[in-house]
Amino acid sequence: MNVTADGLRFPDGFLWGASTAAHQIEGNNVNSDWWHMEHSGGSIAEPSGDAADSYHRWREDMDLLAQLGFTDYRFSIEWARIEPAPGHFSRAEIAHYRRMVDGAIERGLRPMVTLHHFTVPRWFAERGGWTADGAAELFERYVRATAPIIATGVRHVCTINEPNMIAVFGAIRELGAEAPPTAGLVLPDKATTDALIQAHRRATAAVKAISADIQVGWSIANQVYQAQPGAEAATAAYSHPREDVFIEAARDDDWIGVQSYTRTRITTDGPIPAPDDAERTLTGWEYYPQALGYALRHTAAIVGDVPLIVTENGIATGDDSRRINYTTGALQEVSAALEDGLHVHGYLHWSALDNYEWGSYKPTFGLISVAPDTFERTPKPSATWLGGLARTGVLPRATS
């Protein structure tokens, strides 16, 4: 990292990209647990439906990202498509995702492949999910089956996206109708936590058996728990089961994904809502681009020299100028972390596309808008701006 007359120059080889998740953009993920929940008359307000139709339009998505100047694309492959029934692996779906890997490489995009991003096959959920006997072994079996997809041309593999949030979801299911807290997160389900860590370790070994050259990690939802005066011990106790235990599990990994959006303030009585005068995004979260700097430093303090990759960071807003402002602030935090010697290897924005945000299409995180009726893609000014940074590797100096 160095400062030039033009601005802050990021290291050569820095990953500049955007991220997506299969269920949120592909459409018609009919064999997944989430599709079943969306159509079971529960609390999910809006089903995913066709999503952004990226299952058929992935080439267009990659064309745009490459044309905009990005060098990296993180996408997930869908377990429910690859193994729609126990032990039945679809050669057609495996070939589909291999075409995506090849398509990224042909366009000059380095593919980062996520093996699990929240959704599981319906049959896996119905047998008890992550806490059922043999769950980690079943995940390992699926990972082994992905060999034709990831064996060549894939440098980075993420085993599980935000396992801490999956454990929180497990606890919420246990609570049933009990209201969630107004700030912070419920205590994760420990059995789910333990199962996910075991699944990650088995998956890591399986990927390494496919190719020792693949760099393997997982990505954590960093909530940025900020201790208010006198609440340092309470904050550490609150953070550990919700975040730190998952970061600790990455100490022997090749890299760890840092995913950050906002902060949560902690008092001796627990988490408190954002300040009344805080700007809020379309998700209701506090606008707080500084969160990424805290997340990087907190993660580095736990994992030491394990490389950090920002695998998600962004903002849900209808005002694209705020997206540019937010991302500028976040990248300033990345540059400061690099200056301080942290091993930050990349920044992948969430999200490449406006997409399905787990019950609603209203929170627009995308650099590229998607027309709901025609699926027409339109890059926003933020996409052109961030792609330009990817081309130059320089974040311009702030102007007064």
Give names to the regions the model predicted.
Residues 1-62, 66-71, 80-400:
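Non-catalytic scaffold segments within catalytic domains of secreted glycoside hydrolases
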